[in-house]
Amino acid sequence: MKRIITVLFATGLLAALATGCKEEYKTYSDAEYVLFADTLATYAVLQDQDYFSVPVSSTVACDYDRTFGVEIIDKGSNAIEGLHYALRSNTITIKAGQRAANVEVRGLYDNIEPTDSLGFILKLVMPEQVNWNLYHDRTKVVMMKSCPYDVNDFTGWCVVTSLFLNQYPGIENTSLQRLIRTEKHPTEENMIILHDWLFSGYDVTIRLDPGDPIEPLVTMDKNQVLADEASVFGQILGDNKILVTNSPLYDSYFNSCQHFVALWICLLYTSPSPRDTR
């Protein structure tokens, strides 16, 4: 069963507290250092994928090949080598005249569950003089399974869960969930029509973007009519329309493995303030 999840977000404004810090800068002149490009990164494991690359950088290019070892650190890792992943090689070589190389990792797709978040730590084995203390010789690789995308997986009967319905059920809703029907838009690519989404008689559309397996985003066209004010609030506050669009604060996303969509939305109506919801 497909699922669409929307959760009521607090109406109050959230304040972010910023703390000051001192930054310590280190300069160098033609010094050679080798390091992972990121200390933590997430990678998609795809069904038809050969290897994904964990980048390693050097501060300078040399006129000779440089080879370094790659060690797997068990502490802090929950992925198992040989079960969840395998390295192409336990060494990397930065070619003469170049400043980068990759540790190539094969994610073992069939052994990773859709809900798994598996990580392991890699360490560069290299001479001390090329290890820059400002950065680290280690990186954590996090793997997420990304199933093949098919827009039809998000069509058909669908259970909608929304905390908005707990606060504003209107005259028809009696729980946080609704059973609705979804279908592929007849002309717009990757667009889904949600029939009677939160209130009967009001359809909305969403668009799925499968371009980045790590960030499978969902967008909505602006100013779609979610419901009429009288049915939801019991009174007409203005033009009797409640509009819905993307939340400017949070990204909406979908999951091809578990066939669900999580929508962060913003409601607009004649009221002292709009409400952010998910």
Predicted regions and their residues:
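Bacterial N-terminal signal peptides that target proteins for export
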Residues: 1-8
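Hydrophobic helical h-region of N-terminal Sec-dependent signal peptides
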Residues: 9-14
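C-terminal motif of bacterial Sec signal peptides marking the signal peptidase cleavage site
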Residues: 17-20
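Acidic/polar, low-complexity intrinsically disordered N-terminal segments immediately downstream
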Residues: 22-161
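N-terminal glycine/threonine-rich, aromatic-flanked beta-hairpin/loop signature
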Residues: 166-218
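Short, hydrophobic/proline-enriched secondary-structure or compact coil segments at domain edges
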Residues: 189-197, 258-268
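Contiguous, well-ordered beta-strand patches that form the walls/edges
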Residues: 195-257
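Single conserved hydrophobic/aromatic residue that forms the stacking wall/gate
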Residues: 269-278
